[in-house]
């Protein structure tokens, strides 16, 4: 089976889940799947995907896995006790052919946030691996290894010694086995330039650093859970700070567009959070504006981190490093380009939260094609509230 452990997911699912347990245990949410590749027919693979999800829902955390989580400084004991009882339930997920009859499939995840938050990453990994295992029966492993070696070598040139990358590629990986190979090669070839992985299973298995803080779904849910819509981003950041007390201090900047983020990210947040993550829009313009914002708030940019994670490849990593090196702390999270580049077109698939407590929620990305909402009227209202054109 594809997913062999409930740890085979991104760290930020655990960090967000802990906030949900402590602050929003009664929240009810809905997620929907979308494949952005035109012409891809996923319908023939529905039964195989269902079988993998059935297996996923049979998994439990082992004592060794719980002990590992207990050893992470930001994970609290009551959360680990909850995970000891936790399992995913099939009753919260439905998969069927889309009504559009164009090869798309509908995957709807609906239920208590606390009991559905762990579906997204493994389900996306399942869809990917089911699809590629059936469309590429004899993968071009040698080509994949050649490309990987070339990419990693491009980061070991003189002058790039402090350029560090991390793996953010679980959800869109070619396969579990290839993912592990990529991580082992990255650590072997890059040494200290390999910062770690977002994947908790591989971090535990290979003694790597697990990385991650928050995702868009957390800030989106706060549109419904906060005191009023305009204050939802501030509410989300303040709630995060109350939970982690200065730990896990990387804020995600594009849920409501970067302009709205800068308006909300005042001197208090600039000093409190360790840095900011970029996930859409022009990264060079974003970085310049973020550094200028820190300076305007009388915060030394060199004390803060800029994390880049939007569709990175190695040439872009190098260009960003050369632009911002010595001006701030830097980190780069590389996803699909690292874990799914054997010469085939990767699937552009996502699972996004669309409702919380019966109300629509949305992300106003700095890349319009990333915006996903099933209620156009709410999307227009959200843009008006946050001043997004």
Swiss-Prot record:
<dbReference type="Pfam" id="PF04095">
    <property type="entry name" value="NAPRTase"/>
</dbReference>
<keyword id="KW-0662">Pyridine nucleotide biosynthesis</keyword>
<protein>
    <recommendedName>
        <fullName>Nicotinate phosphoribosyltransferase</fullName>
        <ecNumber>6.3.4.21</ecNumber>
    </recommendedName>
</protein>
<comment type="function">
    <text>Catalyzes the synthesis of beta-nicotinate D-ribonucleotide from nicotinate and 5-phospho-D-ribose 1-phosphate at the expense of ATP.</text>
</comment>
<dbReference type="GO" id="GO:0004516">
    <property type="term" value="F:nicotinate phosphoribosyltransferase activity"/>
</dbReference>
<dbReference type="GO" id="GO:0005829">
    <property type="term" value="C:cytosol"/>
</dbReference>
<keyword id="KW-0597">Phosphoprotein</keyword>
<dbReference type="InterPro" id="IPR040727">
    <property type="entry name" value="NAPRTase_N"/>
</dbReference>
<comment type="similarity">
    <text>Belongs to the NAPRTase family.</text>
</comment>
<comment type="pathway">
    <text>Cofactor biosynthesis; NAD(+) biosynthesis; nicotinate D-ribonucleotide from nicotinate: step 1/1.</text>
</comment>
<dbReference type="InterPro" id="IPR036068">
    <property type="entry name" value="Nicotinate_pribotase-like_C"/>
</dbReference>
<feature type="modified residue" description="Phosphohistidine; by autocatalysis">
    <location>
        <position position="216"/>
    </location>
</feature>
<dbReference type="InterPro" id="IPR041525">
    <property type="entry name" value="N/Namide_PRibTrfase"/>
</dbReference>
<dbReference type="InterPro" id="IPR007229">
    <property type="entry name" value="Nic_PRibTrfase-Fam"/>
</dbReference>
<dbReference type="GO" id="GO:0034355">
    <property type="term" value="P:NAD biosynthetic process via the salvage pathway"/>
</dbReference>
<dbReference type="Pfam" id="PF17767">
    <property type="entry name" value="NAPRTase_N"/>
</dbReference>
<keyword id="KW-0436">Ligase</keyword>
<dbReference type="InterPro" id="IPR006406">
    <property type="entry name" value="Nic_PRibTrfase"/>
</dbReference>
